[in-house]
Amino acid sequence: MVALSAQRRRQGFTLVELLVVIVIIGILASLLLPVITHALFRARVTACASNQSQLYKLGTVYATSHKGAWPSAKGEELWLSLRKLVPPLIEADHAGILHCGVLEHELGPDETGYRGPVTTFGRIGATDPLGADKPGNHGEQYGGNVLFKDGSVAEFELDHPKWQEYATKLSP
């Protein structure tokens, strides 16, 4: 009988064993949290670049039906004009392409998260930027994405000389 009661007591975990398991899970979670946070940030940066690429494609669709001409607007107005000029392609449910997914705040109806060209599309050089994130879109310590006339999008760090150069070639 004594052996049977000893077996019954040994079936569960002790409090110390449970606490050790909880501590180990806590340590693993604290190690994974920064990795997950960074992965989510990178996903938003990629979504932001995708939005810029979609805006370029929208402009190309507009130009196809207007003898190769893009809207004559400059700066942020270029992106807003595409929204007005090609309404079936960018209705309210697709208006999300007008802002960067990294932004923590909502934009107004006449705002975008991107800068536009200081001149009309036809006057932009082949290697000049067509658009870019507004400063701070990716946080104060990061640069942003730049959209080029050929439709490619590149990411630049804040201290990269090209980021500073492109920022001055685009209007807010």
Please provide the spans of the model-predicted regions:
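Acidic, glycine-rich loop-and-strand cores that form catalytic or ligand-binding grooves
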Residues: 84-127
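Conserved hydrophobic/amphipathic alpha-helical signal-anchor segments
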Residues: 30, 34-97, 152-153, 162-171
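N-terminal leader/signal peptides at the extreme start of proteins
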Residues: 1-13, 172
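N-terminal single-pass transmembrane signal-anchor helix
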Residues: 9-40
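C-terminal accessory segments of extracellular proteins
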Residues: 2, 124-172
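Acidic-and-aromatic substrate-binding clefts and catalytic sites of carbohydrate-active enzymes
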Residues: 74-80, 105-108, 137
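Short beta-strand segments
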Residues: 72-74, 97-102, 130-133, 147-148
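Short, flexible active-site-adjacent loop segments at beta-strand->alpha-helix junctions, enriched
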Residues: 61, 103-106, 135, 152
